[in-house]
């Protein structure tokens, strides 16, 4: 067998004008070769066809450019038949194998084409030498070897039995009807990778093969032979030379690796090679609008494309669903509040009435009468016709379907109705009053009248029953309004709630700690608030219980102390032991109103009562002088200023006692002592106290206290000792904040009375009780002898029988400055502040006795330091 070698190297071409010239030249030479082959037989025709392909390749090689594109040169039918005839001479296993490869749409290597044609030429030469077959026999053999391709079944029409075809990346899957060996042969190809980009070479282009091959080994594939994508690679640079080394000619040769070093298709030169993106497919090009079918597969039918699109949509939908599920699962895991955990009470701003409320909020019977449709009225006919016209405009297609029944409607509406006599009477309100319905066909009543009468009777009964039920619900609500909670009633008084509209469900949602016009609390918030409210209520109740217990205990103690006061008074209050008990009791309980006047007289002047009889001016005598004289105007205005300054602008002022107070002050002004600091406060509080029955008692006790407890010696000691930097008061008020107050102009006896002006009457009397008792004298050991004191003045009496106790006054001032120094700057400023200010401040929830007792305890604590 003579071998043929191709002298020229193939070069890539561009498919522009060169492609059209190359195709035209190839077709012309192919036709000449086909005609010649028909005359000379299968062998000669094959060679002529081969020459035609070679000539076409040379023509394309002459117009080659730097870009490589895929080129398929069409061949004539006679050319294909000549090649088929040459292939039909193959016998034995080669014949069956070649027929199987050609008859099935499966890819084949270029080396397989070469091996097949070499075998066919070698068998043809042996047949020519032995006589061979005639062309007709060859054609018959070809017809038997290559059957007419039949359209595969629906399962085999798709190239793979699995869903690999429907993936996004095109793959070279085997045909469903192909065998396993064909599948291996189809994938047993050589790929060229690395830095050079490879493209698919056209089957009509010749290869530059080694010198061991002859020209007869170059085969042009027929229309049933295919070239696997990626089996051949051509570089973009036109100057590059390629060397193809066929390692093995049989069908079972192994695939060539895709590395640059081991590739059988190597670049000898041509450094300027085209680069491709990593991951890009270099096997073949196809349209995005069609399926990823290789050139070796047939075009898909519409049903196949539909199945492909459906499968791709399902895959994309499943992928999207999985992504969304994953996203929402991640989001749900981060949410603090799930939808299931949303409390229904949070949706509060939607006005919804319960059935018990909405039952009597419906329209009354008069409104229902207006809404009833009268069929015989022409106005109702126009309304119905207008509704039908509007419906025709909105739903033209739907109304066309029912157009047969619509023309009959105006006739029924315009047809005069015979109304029975009983329907023109009063409407029926009870089911028992409904008359017997006439039987259609027997009575002289049409079907329309029968239905209309029945509907009207039932409607009137239903409306009446609804009205009665609404009236009953309304009466029930009105009767239950008096049992509603107080907070709801308060909102009704403010015009923010209607008691009739308050249902049981609303009462369940409303909480007592929030107004009804505000949004209700959530379940969690309501439970938390109820827990806190119950806790505070428990604390308040415990405190109230303790307060009541202490009040009860204090009342019992006061009662016992009052009995002790009476017992001490009977036993002798001027005894030393009695005075000790009296001092102890006075810090716990004030003297009772019944015993105060007698105790004051006994403690301050003993049972002899020498001071009242000798050193005090008589009340009746001064009053008679006042009646006989014209009281000076300037003195009267001075008294009014004193009352306004010390009494009127202070707490507890009452205008009822103004005349008595003015009289006492006038009497004091015309006395030998004259008006003194504190007279107005003493007279005013004694007048408001029940301990003194007459003005004479008040006059004597007030003057007695002024002469004994607040005498001149006590005043001088108070003014000098209270501002002494080494005194007890200075040590108690050692804070730098009191430095500005420790002056003689601020801390003195006159400013001390500013404190007494701000004290309530009950506490004032208790303070006076303590001051009087702390200034007591043990007259049992020092009994007063009237004969010895007959010629003695008041100063002698004070030095011998009066106790000077300025410490009780200084301790009171220190206690007020330490514990109640708020609302005023100093004792001098205390005179000019609001008249409602008092010491101590009282609250409505706290008992006055408890506050007064607390004040006395603090004062006693400071007095112990003196």
Curated annotation (Swiss-Prot):
Coiled coil: none
Alphabetical UniProt keywords: Cell wall biogenesis/degradation, Golgi apparatus, Protein transport, Transport
Record's compositionally biased regions (Low complexity): 79-94, 252-263
Domain of life where this protein originates: Eukaryota
One term under GO cellular component: Golgi apparatus
Pfam family, one: SBE2_M
GO biological process: fungal-type cell wall organization; protein transport
Localization per record: Golgi apparatus
Sequence similarity: Belongs to the SBE2 family.
Name of the protein in its database record: Protein SBE2
Native organism: Candida glabrata (strain ATCC 2001 / BCRC 20586 / JCM 3761 / NBRC 0622 / NRRL Y-65 / CBS 138)
